[in-house]
Amino acid sequence: MKFKHSLMSNNFTKSDMDQVKKFVNHKNIILTQSKKVNEFEKKWSKWIGVKYSVFVNSGSSANFITMSALKIINKNKVKNEIIVPTLTWVSDINSVVMNGFKPVFVDINFSNLSMNVEEVLKKI
C-alpha cells in the first residue's frame, strides 16, 4: 500500500547541520546540560510562553517524562488509562506502562496514519 504521506523525511538544512557540527566539535562538549542547551531551553520557553522547559536526549525520554508528570497531576484521579495508537513505537507504550497507566489502543486512520478520531471518541 502506498501512503499519501511518508513516515519520515529529511528537513535539516545545511545551516542546521553547520550549527550542529560547530556544537559537537566544541572542545568542552556537554550534550545535555551545557550552557548552550540552557540558553536554548530559556529561548524555547519564552517562545512558547511557559516558565520552564526541559530538553532530553530522545523522544522516548520525552514521552517518559511526560507520563511521569501526568502521573503526578493525575495522582488522585480514578481513570488511569491513556489512549494510544496501534501504529506506534514500543517506547511510547513503555512510557505509559512504566508510569502505572493502562494503554487503550485505538486504530489509525489509513489516509494520514493518525489516530482514528471516531475510535478515540468511543474510548473516552
Predicted regions and their residues:
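Phosphate-binding glycine-rich loop
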Residues: 30-31, 35, 39-81, 95, ...
